[in-house]
Amino acid sequence: LGLVGSEMCIRDRYEEKMYAVGKIPGGFNKREGKASENAILTSRVIDRPMRPLFPKDYRNDVTLNNMVMSVDPECDPEVVAMLGSAIATCISDIPFDGPCAMTQIGMIDGEFIVNPTLAQKAVSDLKLTVASTREKVIMIEAGAKEIPEAKMIDAIYKAHEVNQEIIKFIDSIVAEVGKPKHAYESCAIPEELFAAIKEIVPPAEMEEAVFSDDKQTREENIRVITEKLEEAFADNEEWLAGL
């Protein structure tokens, strides 16, 4: 998964290697082939809680590779993959407002089960995934068989409580082997530039230009506005670079 342009690019790959079980795909789809649906969904589960914790003005590319070679067949590897990604990022020199942790909660006969096995998930009335930081819950993914709202809230609190223990464990690893976070050049656009743009091109005029239904008209409007701003900021190279 990745975003390019004005956003930071994070590539999050979760891949279960075929050669780990002695299979070398051939035929039309050679080698590993494209990512499976499960791999894509797992990558998204990893990406969602972690992406907002990177600095908003950070533009360096970040790649998280989760190559699954061996797993316990009774356990879902997506939780371990997310925790591995979080730990690797926390101990690296990459700026990251972590740690974060993720826990799955099931419910059988009214009792909560932390990180249920696949067999337990098959008969569970609840499939809940919760990611947390120290301060709050940052992601909830859930499916349930009409359980009471109070039970769902209790399950979220339970997962958040478990996540705090995991975060303490991550902190101990960072204290032992963590690297200092490296300095980086902020890509945030100065507030003064925003204010100057609003004076030259009022928000109403900007909205009318960019929300045109016709693509050619929209591109022409943007070109005209860009030329107007470049002319206004001709003496300010730093602001020109931000346009």
Predicted segments, located by residue:
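Gly/Ser-rich oxyanion-binding loop with an adjacent helix/lid
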Residues: D61-V114
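Flexible, glycine/charged-enriched surface loops at secondary-structure junctions
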Residues: L53-V62, D97-P99, I166-Y184, Q216, ...
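Glycine- and acidic-rich phosphate- and metal-coordinating loops
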Residues: P25-N29, D47, D57-V71, M139-E141
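Stable alpha-helical structural segments in soluble proteins, enriched in small hydrophobic residues
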Residues: P49, V80-S92, A155, V162-I166, ...
